[in-house]
Amino acid sequence: IQNMSQTGSWKDINATGESGLIDKNVFSVWINHGLNPENASYQYIVVPDKSINAFRDLAEQIDFYIAQNDGSVQAIREGNKYGFVFYKSASTKMDDGLVISSDKPSIVFIEKKGNTYTIAVSDPTYTQANVTLTLNKKMIEKSGVTITEQGNNIIFTLPVGDYVGSSVVDVFTEK
């Protein structure tokens, strides 16, 4: 654990960021995995702004299903909410039968209510013009933002400029 002053600019981590230097206290936490760990894994959640008692209560109630946690995909479900980190083009299957693929690195969040899916997609690499998700569901586009649909392939057009890396969100209904 570390809390120390660090200096840098937003441009250091984002090509469209401002180049002026900023000096702020930065809190860091890390786990020392040792040298060359083999077949080692761990999982964790971040729970900000909770007292120790609130955290204990939450820990007793949480019921996560972890479908995959490797170098290709991190996939988790809690109730009707799904979270995915695709490190490369990959596919994963959840315990309730949902199968999802991404053609590129992406971060995806899905919330399912009945036959309606709210899907949020972002590009952690800040380099992609679009991401295609393939689901084992046929969807009807419910709201028309910058997303086109082809069968069970949903193509998300990603933001550029000042908004690069931000999420694109749309709502779909299963056919």
Annotate each PLM feature.
Residues V47-K175:
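Non-catalytic terminal regions with compositionally biased, polar/charged low complexity
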Residues D23-N39:
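A surface-exposed beta-strand-loop module
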Residues G17-S19, N32, F64:
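Short, flexible coil/linker segments at or flanking structured domains
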Residues S5-Q6, V26, S41, N130-L135, ...:
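C-terminal amphipathic "assembly/sorting" segment characterized by alternating charged
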Residues I1-S28, K93-M94, V99-I100, M139-K142, ...:
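Trp/Gly-enriched beta-strand surface patches
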